[in-house]
Amino acid sequence: MPSIETQSTSPPPLRIPHREASAHKGNFGRVLLIGGSRGMAGSIALSSIAALHTGSGLVAAAVPDCILDCVAGFHPALMTIGLGDDGEKFADPAWQSLKDRLSAQAAIGCGPGMTTGSGGATIVEGLLAKKDLPLVLDADALNIIAQNDWLSDGRFERSKADAACVLTPHPGELQRLTGASAKDVDAQVEAAAELACRLGLTIVVKGGPSHVAYQNGDGGKQVWQNTTGNPGMATAGCGDVLTGIVTSLLGQGLSGPDAAKLGVWIHGRCGDEAAARWSHAGMTSLHALDALALVADEMTQPAD
């Protein structure tokens, strides 16, 4: 096992960047969340709204046309981009409509609710080639990568000159990516650390507790262990909220490891606030999302 850096229950030393009085929305990152399908509109909506509440100045959701109106109705500040679909999910031409919009983004998150069809696969494949854009990959984006064995063909490798790439798998997704059993936490953390170090990625190993694996400054394996969060967060949509938080932090200029560590800590703190009010059994991802704005404010860098 690599050495594990354990964060105490006090707030981590990382902070969301301070907001100057003269700032405008363009100073806080334009981010794009990509995903959703018929029956899974809530996933991409949760991610996108989480990015708004974490402080992103502008957030857009790129979704199949068939769910555009549904996703747009979740929040009036959320911009939406409709892409070609087959009536259920992204169709193959969706990437051609999307790719010219990417250069304006400070960070991109992809995967929540997307399904693993060929249209989604074309989008993920295109994003992997854009190594100048900070990227978060979650959910079905990870399943697509596992199905196509894209971790082993070189397209994932990141140098220090490339933008950050953060993966946020749950245990089942990590098993599909690495072969490490979802029932063996130590094996999963070790596999994530090896993969992160080999390819220059940051990997969030979601669980109780969650870990963040990344390459340290000496090129070795580093693992950080979080201490916020609770079993009530094992509920639909909580992972989607994390995707939005980490994407927002990347868009505000944090590095991959810092965005992942601070994002996981904030996410768990939101879950703790929700559980205190609604109970472990009764809380939902919406309750965690409701706590996010105040928790993010607490974690913002104060003025000098």
Swiss-Prot record:
Binding-site residues, AMP: G239
Keywords: ATP-binding, Lyase, NAD, NADP, Nucleotide-binding
A GO term, aspect molecular function: ATP binding
Reactions mediated catalytically: (6S)-NADHX + ADP = AMP + phosphate + NADH + H(+); (6S)-NADPHX + ADP = AMP + phosphate + NADPH + H(+)
InterPro entries: Carbohydrate_kinase_pred_CS, CARKD, Ribokinase-like
Pfam families assigned: Carb_kinase
One of the GO biological process terms: metabolite repair
Protein family according to the UniProt entry: Belongs to the NnrD/CARKD family.
Protein's job: Catalyzes the dehydration of the S-form of NAD(P)HX at the expense of ADP, which is converted to AMP. Together with NAD(P)HX epimerase, which catalyzes the epimerization of the S- and R-forms, the enzyme allows the repair of both epimers of NAD(P)HX, a damaged form of NAD(P)H that is a result of enzymatic or heat-dependent hydration.
Protein name: ADP-dependent (S)-NAD(P)H-hydrate dehydratase
Lineage: Bacteria, Pseudomonadati, Planctomycetota, Planctomycetia, Pirellulales
